[in-house]
């Protein structure tokens, strides 16, 4: 077989082979390392992997792109399964307020917090929204991310939510990355509905969800299930309505108080449940039985400086397939750097480097229902490959705060070279 790309002499090839399934519990430690490895790519697919000399089955021709992996660590393309990337404006002024001890609710009363992002996003033109978001996507790509999930939720009304989701579709035409759209109109309750939140929930169910489905603008529906936002019963109503229309379910669950979001995720068998810092042991065990992927967002805990992180060790003990994501947003986690999240995962969630690699590849793929296509280096899978200028996988989270990416392939094409987006 003639091949288009040959990555040879790979010092450490981290395949994360999983046969189309997430890695649960102790399985996360097994990342399928091959020393002195090679990868053969034809078209947009991986057609061969091995160690030492390339198999005689593959023909390296004059048009084959040859990449040296000497001194490098090669992993599946990284996946960021939870972001709020499409938004306008920024909130750096809140850092000084936070340092002075001003509570978030007080910032909200002053017109800051999520409401300032909602207002900025509503005012922004489509062109402004796309231009700002494209910069963030390019940063993510430079850090080795080849697939990213993006939520709406800074509109909180039909027209503005549609604008965010349409921006995601425009961005897909401008990036080689795969973008996964999530409708999150239930991100907060608008101030005009504070006295009657049920009216807003009716609006989501009766108007927003059908309109977004008709335009085919989102694959997933997500709800912020939290005290003072959407109750368990309200969340159930929205997610069941979304599922009846064909949306897959996600849930922001038990971030601040143990409300029962993890239990609801298990009951509804959502694809994933995110945050989970306050999730009960019962809820986590139920999630394990229902094959729900927990998505930990340690960058948010780090930035909020609360000292409270999701209990990843307990999740792994219960046999859950832990995923990690940036939660990139302008308020609680303004970073596109998935490598930093990997370091925080090791240092604060006490995950091993192997577990962290599983969490940003195959388990992140499971959190967006993509394990058959991406998340591991296996024959037949999409050739999404990240090459790090690092001698082994341990070096990536160990040497934190810098970008270790040398080269990124997306669907078999080089899209980052020498650390720069092409």
From Swiss-Prot:
Q: What is its EC number?
A: 3.5.2.7
Record's keyword annotation contains Zinc: yes
Residues involved in Fe(3+) binding: 82, 84, 252, 327
Which InterPro entries does the entry link to? Amidohydro-rel (IPR006680), HutI (IPR005920), Metal-dep_hydrolase_composite (IPR011059), Metal_Hydrolase (IPR032466)
* Gene Ontology MF, one: imidazolonepropionase activity
Give the SUPFAM superfamilies listed for this entry: Composite domain of metallo-dependent hydrolases, Metallo-dependent hydrolases
Localization per record? Cytoplasm
Q: Which Pfam families match?
A: Amidohydro_1
**Protein name, UniProt field:** Imidazolonepropionase
User: What's the gene?
Assistant: hutI
């Amino acid at each position: 077989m003639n091949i288009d790309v040959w990555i040879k002499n790979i010092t450490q090839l981290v395949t994360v082979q999983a046969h189309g399934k997430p890695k649960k519990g102790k399985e996360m430690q097994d990342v399928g390392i091959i020393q002195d490895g090679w990868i053969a790519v034809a078209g947009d697919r991986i057609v061969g992997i091995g160690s030492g000399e390339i198999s005689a089955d593959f023909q390296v021709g004059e048009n084959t792109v040859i990449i040296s992996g000497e001194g490098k660590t090669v992993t599946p393309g990284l996946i960021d399964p939870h972001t709020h990337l499409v938004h306008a404006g920024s909130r750096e002024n809140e850092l000084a307020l936070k340092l002075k001890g001003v509570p978030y609710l007080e910032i909200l009363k002053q017109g800051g917090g999520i409401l300032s992002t909602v207002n900025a996003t509503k005012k922004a033109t489509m062109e402004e929204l796309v231009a700002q978001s494209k910069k963030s996507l390019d940063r993510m790509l430079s850090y080795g991310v080849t697939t990213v999930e993006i939520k709406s939720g800074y509109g909180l009304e039909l027209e503005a939510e549609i604008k965010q989701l349409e921006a995601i579709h425009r961005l897909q035409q401008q990036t080689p990355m795969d973008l996964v759209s999530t409708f999150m109109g239930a991100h907060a309750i608008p101030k005009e509905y504070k006295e009657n939140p049920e009216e807003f929930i009716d609006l989501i169910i009766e108007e927003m969800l059908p309109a977004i489905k008709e335009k085919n603008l989102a694959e997933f529906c997500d709800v912020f299930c939290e005290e003072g936002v959407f109750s368990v019963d309200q969340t159930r109503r929205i997610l069941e309505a979304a599922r009846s229309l064909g949306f897959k379910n996600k849930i922001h669950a038990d971030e601040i108080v143990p409300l029962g979001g993890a239990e609801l995720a298990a009951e509804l068998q959502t694809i994933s449940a995110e945050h989970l810092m306050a999730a009960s042991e019962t809820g986590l065990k139920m999630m394990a039985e229902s094959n729900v992927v927990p998505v930990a967002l340690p960058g948010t805990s780090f930035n909020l400086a609360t000292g409270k992180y999701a209990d990843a060790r307990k999740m792994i003990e219960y046999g859950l397939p832990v995923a990690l994501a940036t939660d990139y947003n302008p308020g609680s986690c303004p970073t596109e750097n998935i490598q930093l999240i990997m370091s925080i995962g090791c240092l604060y969630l006490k995950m091993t480097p192997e577990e962290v690699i599983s969490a940003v590849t195959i388990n992140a793929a499971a959190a967006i229902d993509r394990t058959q296509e991406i998340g591991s280096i296996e024959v037949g899978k999409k050739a999404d490959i990240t090459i790090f200028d690092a001698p082994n996988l341990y070096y990536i989270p160990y040497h934190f705060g810098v970008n270790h990416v040398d080269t990124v392939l997306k669907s078999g094409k080089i899209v980052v070279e020498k650390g720069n987006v092409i």
